[in-house]
């Protein structure tokens, strides 16, 4: 089950396409992969940017899906 949330990009590595988002509700950081972003927003994942996303339970813990700038 997914839950729509907002948060701030904490880290993002362009080479690996992976990073972390800190949810606004104070929950544990959520993993993000470049493939979870809308195509035209993939270059905008820089630390400090506010995003909206759906939180899903991935194989390695909380994961972001359907990520876009808020």
Curated annotation (Swiss-Prot):
Q: GO biological process annotations for this chain's record?
A: regulation of gene expression
Q: Which InterPro entries match?
A: Cold_shock_CspA, Cold_shock_domain, CSD, CSD_CS, CSP_DNA-bd, NA-bd_OB-fold
Query: According to its UniProt record, what is one Pfam family this protein matches?
Result: CSD
Supply one GO CC term from the record: cytosol
Q: Which residues form the CSD domain?
A: 7-67
Q: Which UniProt keywords apply?
A: Activator, Cytoplasm, DNA-binding, Transcription, Transcription regulation
**Main subcellular location of this protein, as a coarse class:** cytoplasm
Q: Which domain of life is it from?
A: Bacteria
Per the UniProt record, the source organism is Salmonella typhimurium (strain LT2 / SGSC1412 / ATCC 700720)
Q: Tell me if Amino-acid biosynthesis is a UniProt keyword of this record.
A: no
**Could you confirm whether the keyword DNA-binding appears in this record?**
yes
What protein is this chain from?
A: Cold shock-like protein CspH
GO MF annotations, alphabetized: DNA binding; nucleic acid binding
Enumerate the subcellular locations listed in this protein's record, separating them with semicolons: Cytoplasm
């Amino acid at each position: 089950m997914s839950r729509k949330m907002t948060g701030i990009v904490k880290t993002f590595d362009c080479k690996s396409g992976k990073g972390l988002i800190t949810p606004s509700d104070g929950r544990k950081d959520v993993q993000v992969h470049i493939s979870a972003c809308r195509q035209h927003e993939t270059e905008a994942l820089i630390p400090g940017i506010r995003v909206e996303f759906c939180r899903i339970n991935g194989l390695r813990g909380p994961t972001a899906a359907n990520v876009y700038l808020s």
